[in-house]
């Protein structure tokens, strides 16, 4: 509890300083320290990001930040981790030539293959690490949700979440076209260029794992293309098809039929 108190005081004082002296009332959840470390504060609801990163670091060669320590308290989870030098891919992608882009794609594809190869401990359970509740901005209006015993239960939840905005007949048609007989694989859940740090044409780190967990195998593809408020880059959208190991265009289009109407999910 002492660590959580120190982190909370740090965020309170730093937020006060930024708001009062720098005219920055909304400073975000991440603070970069001068000692080569980063502090992140997140909600207790849903995934335990620190343990997810430790799990990925232990079981794959995917580059992730090193966690120095983590703790919980005051309704928040705090994580102290190393600062990874580099540029976010969202910015670097626009200036890369075809060879550089191909190198990035090759690395990212190999990392997703590793991620999807992790053995699910309790398949077909759809959940975060350790069988806990899921957290996803696709359904952020509902906070944490799940876990779900099966993929079918997860799909039922997606349809239920869309019910306030979509006619029942239309939803029943969408649900009838969802395939429940698919694998559950470990999924980053927010595999976007803003969460990939590069140095030149080398992937330095993949960050922001708070939405990760065991999801239907198509979910990574759907979420990689889900950016309602972000920069839409068609070249990146096309590239996602070469990064995710299988074709899930059908599942993505089906999900879009719902999300195009779901104002509350955005």
Regions found by a protein language model. Name each.
Residues 19-140, 148, 183:
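ATP-binding pocket architecture of kinase catalytic cores
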Residues 45-49, 193, 202:
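Plant-skewed but cross-kingdom recognition/interaction modules and surfaces
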Residues 122-176:
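Acidic, glycine-rich loop-and-strand cores that form catalytic or ligand-binding grooves
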Residues 20, 239-266:
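Charged phosphate-binding loop/patch that engages nucleotide di/tri-phosphates or the phosphate backbone
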Residues 1-20:
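Juxta-kinase regulatory segment immediately upstream of eukaryotic protein kinase catalytic domains
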Residues 151, 181, 185-186, 199-249:
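Active-site Asp-x-Gly
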Residues 186-188, 193:
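Catalytic-loop of the protein kinase fold
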């Amino acid at each position: 509890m002492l660590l959580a108190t120190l982190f909370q005081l740090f965020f309170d004082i730093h937020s006060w300083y930024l708001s009062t002296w720098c005219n920055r009332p909304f400073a975000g959840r991440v603070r970069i320290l001068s000692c080569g470390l980063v502090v992140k504060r997140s909600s207790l609801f849903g995934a335990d990001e620190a343990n997810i990163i430790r799990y990925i670091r232990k079981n794959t060669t995917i580059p992730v930040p090193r966690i120095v320590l983590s703790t919980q308290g005051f309704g928040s989870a705090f994580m102290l981790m190393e600062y990874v030098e580099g540029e976010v891919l969202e910015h670097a992608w626009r200036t890369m030539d075809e060879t550089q882009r191909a190198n990035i794609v090759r690395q990212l594809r190999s990392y997703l293959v590793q991620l999807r190869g992790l053995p699910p401990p309790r398949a077909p359970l759809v959940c975060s690490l350790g069988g806990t509740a899921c957290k996803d901005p696709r359904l952020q209006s509902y906070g944490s949700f799940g876990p779900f015993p099966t993929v079918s239960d997860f799909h039922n939840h997606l349809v239920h979440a869309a019910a306030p905005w979509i006619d029942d007949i239309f939803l029943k048609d969408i649900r009838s076209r969802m395939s429940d007989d698919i694998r559950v694989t470990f999924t980053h859940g927010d595999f976007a260029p803003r969460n990939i740090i590069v140095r030149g044409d080398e992937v330095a780190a993949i960050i922001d794992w708070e939405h990760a967990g065991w999801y239907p195998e198509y979910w990574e593809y759907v979420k990689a293309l889900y950016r309602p408020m972000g920069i839409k880059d068609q070249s990146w959208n096309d590239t996602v098809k070469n990064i995710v190991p299988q074709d899930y265009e059908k599942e993505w289009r089906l999900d879009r039929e719902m999300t195009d109407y779901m104002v509350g999910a955005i």
